[in-house]
A protein has these predicted regions:
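Structural detector for short beta-strands of small beta-barrel domains
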Residues: 1-11, 63-84, 113
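Flexible glycine-rich surface loops and low-complexity tracts that mediate binding to linear polymers
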Residues: 6, 39-52, 108-122
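Short, basic/aromatic beta-hairpin or loop at an interaction surface
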Residues: 12-23, 83-92
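Acidic (E/D-rich), amphipathic helical modules within compact regulatory domains
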Residues: 14-59
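Beta-strand/loop nucleic-acid-binding surfaces
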Residues: 21-36, 91-119
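Low-complexity, flexible helical/coil segments
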Residues: 40, 54-58, 78-86, 113-117
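Short coil-to-beta transition motif at edge beta-strands of beta-rich domains
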Residues: 59-63, 108-110
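Glycine- and charge-enriched low-complexity intrinsically disordered segments
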Residues: 69-107
Length: 122
């Protein structure tokens, strides 16, 4: 995941919105404190905050990330890669959910969900 663009919300407070891309998909993420700039590589998972509408999808579903209404809210279709840490993958994006996954979700399942915001953890 690479920082494509950094838009400062407040330079004094070190708050920024980052556009993050893997060349195929992209998302907007909140960062505070932000020490990132365009071209930086992100190695840590992104954090999906305020998770809603988790649903199991068909195993042959194609992963996607969709920004909702030009905000920091997003909709995802991703593969579950770690149940204990609530980690999912969409393309090369690794996303940690801020809530535990429901009990009927298994490792390798494709799930869809929405979140109120994506945060850069590091």
């Amino acid at each position: 995941m690479i920082v494509k663009q950094c838009e400062w919300i407040s330079k004094d407070a070190k708050e920024a919105m980052l556009i993050i891309s893997d060349g195929k998909m992209q998302c907007a993420a909140f960062s505070h404190p932000c020490y990132r700039s365009a071209g930086d590589v992100l190695l840590e998972p992104l954090l999906a905050v305020s998770i809603k509408n988790i649903a199991k999808m068909r195993s042959d579903s194609q992963p996607y990330i969709q920004c909702l209404r030009g905000s920091l809210a997003h909709e995802f279709l991703a593969e579950v890669t770690n149940l204990e840490k609530s980690l999912v993958v969409a393309g090369t994006f690794i996303i940690e959910l801020d809530d535990p996954l429901p009990g009927d979700i298994s490792l390798g399942d494709m799930i869809s969900f929405s979140c109120g915001r994506i945060d850069v953890i590091s």
